[in-house]
Design a protein with these regions (language model features):
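Structural motif
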Residues: 36, 79-82, 114
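Short, low-complexity N-terminal intrinsically disordered segments enriched in polar/charged residues
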Residues: 1-33, 42, 139-148
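C-terminal-biased regions
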Residues: 3-6, 67-68, 83, 119-121, ...
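Beta-strand elements of well-folded, non-transmembrane domains
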Residues: 23, 91-96, 111-113
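Short beta-strand edge/turn micro-motifs at domain boundaries
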Residues: 104-138
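Hydrophobic pocket/interface hotspot
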Residues: 18, 30-31, 40, 52, ...
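Surface-exposed, charged secondary-structure patches
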Residues: 3, 10, 41-43, 54-100
């Protein structure tokens, strides 16, 4: 495998670590995945905007402690360049509470290569409208792939 391919595998490792830390509600692990810059930003599916690491930490703690979830990537699109990887992902967010309703979310993760590691610089999540979620699920059931 070419050397550059290994670089982008490491970005996927960061994404997987993010999903794991979210499921564990491990705020310290989550924050270790972010770039150490105040320009870091996060937009939640509910529309909340968080700018800067302190605000992101506080927002993650509030949101994940109030409604712990596990995230399952359903469809992943990757766009990369030498120092940046962008993941555009359709995700199923499953609350830890079995009585709570799961949701479908479109999320974009922007990662940058910093000091030999891939770090999250920006996350933008948008709730998937019910009609789109139903179409998405129907295509998945019929084996057409999610974005055909």
């Amino acid at each position: 495998m070419p050397r550059f391919a290994h670089i982008f595998e490491a970005a996927a490792d960061t994404l997987n670590a993010y999903y794991q830390a979210v499921a564990e509600v491990n705020i310290d692990s989550l924050m270790g995945l972010w770039i150490d810059e105040e320009f870091a930003s996060c937009i939640w599916a509910d529309g909340s905007h968080l700018h800067g690491l302190d605000n992101i930490r506080a927002g993650l703690a509030i949101q994940l402690e109030a409604l712990p979830v596990s995230i399952e990537p359903i469809d992943i699109r990757v766009y990369d360049s030498l120092g940046t990887v962008v993941y555009a992902i359709a995700e199923a967010h499953r609350p830890a509470d079995p009585k709570a309703t799961p949701s479908m979310v479109f999320t974009t993760y922007v990662m940058v290569h910093e000091r030999g590691e891939w770090k999250i610089a920006h996350i933008h999540a948008s709730a998937m409208p019910n009609e789109a979620a139903n179409q998405f699920a129907a295509k998945m059931r019929h084996g057409q792939g999610s974005l055909h």
